[in-house]
Amino acid sequence: MNKSQSFMEIKWVDTHCHLQLLNKNLDENHFKNIEFLVIPGVDVESSSKAKEISSSLEVESYWSAGLHPHDAKLLDTQRHDLEKLFVEADLIGETGLDFYRNLSTKEEQRENFLFHLEFSKQLNKPIIIHCRDSFQDTYDLLVEFNNPSSVILHSWTGGRKWTKRFRELDVYFSISGIVTYETAKDLQLSVQEIPINRLLLETDTPYLTPMPLKGQDNLSLIHISEPTRRRHI
């Protein structure tokens, strides 16, 4: 068996796939190279759906409950249901800060993020963090909470400067299809700064399709993992 063949037959872990959003029925062929996967929630409805899908799959799967920073303004109406889901879920999130779109105010996003951090620490469950144009604020809140539990930085896009800073906090960096983009040179270099035991992969299905598959639903870890693997050879 040559190196290319053995690489294609490796079992992968997909740490972030929104299977709730796929407009198709999934069969086992979609997961033939997957060892296990994580289905994140972004509000009460999608978190409940993540739980339902996770229990129906034959492949090993985990699910999370959370409220996305875009919808942080809905926290007051979803707080009670989220608290109940947090107890059942395997992970907390997707949460965090997105100062690129600001679909909720920064104050609403911070309140929502702190809410998730508190429960992650209280329940000792990993937390999935969305961090876009908010590196300093995210870093400061994690320092304030002294790392609530295992922290996964979802679809990491930070350059070498912020990769180095967050490494100090012993977080996990999850790399998505963005790493295949021509515009992601700094990210491709920053992957070299991540210890292999802190490096995760994700599809972010159905988003962030790798360049060779643009226009299709994103179901491929192979196209994401190949450039990542090359950076660690």
Where does each model-flagged region fall?
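A metal-dependent hydrolase metal-coordination microenvironment
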Residues: N29-H80
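Conserved beta/loop motifs at nucleotide-recognition and modification sites
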Residues: D204
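Single conserved hydrophobic/aromatic residue that forms the stacking wall/gate
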Residues: I222, E226-I233
